[in-house]
UniProtKB/Swiss-Prot annotation:
InterPro entries noted in UniProt: DUF1328 (IPR009760)
Species whose genome carries this gene: Aromatoleum aromaticum (strain DSM 19018 / LMG 30748 / EbN1)
Domain of life the protein comes from: Bacteria
Protein topology in the membrane: Multi-pass membrane protein
Protein name: UPF0391 membrane protein AZOSEA39630
Entry's family note: Belongs to the UPF0391 family.
Ranges annotated as spanning the membrane: 4-24, 37-57
Amino acid sequence: MIKWAIIFFVISVIAGLLGFTGVAAGAAGIARVLFYIALAIFLIVLVFGVLLGVLVF
């Protein structure tokens, strides 16, 4: 998921440099959502790993 967030971030930067502000804003929004979803999943797995004391993966 982080890979897709980075891809959409790069798309938004390139689109912003070329003047396509609508595309840049859309891609940046998608990248932000994917990043926060990946961060939430990471934190949930981290908390379960610490609380249960087992290796999750």
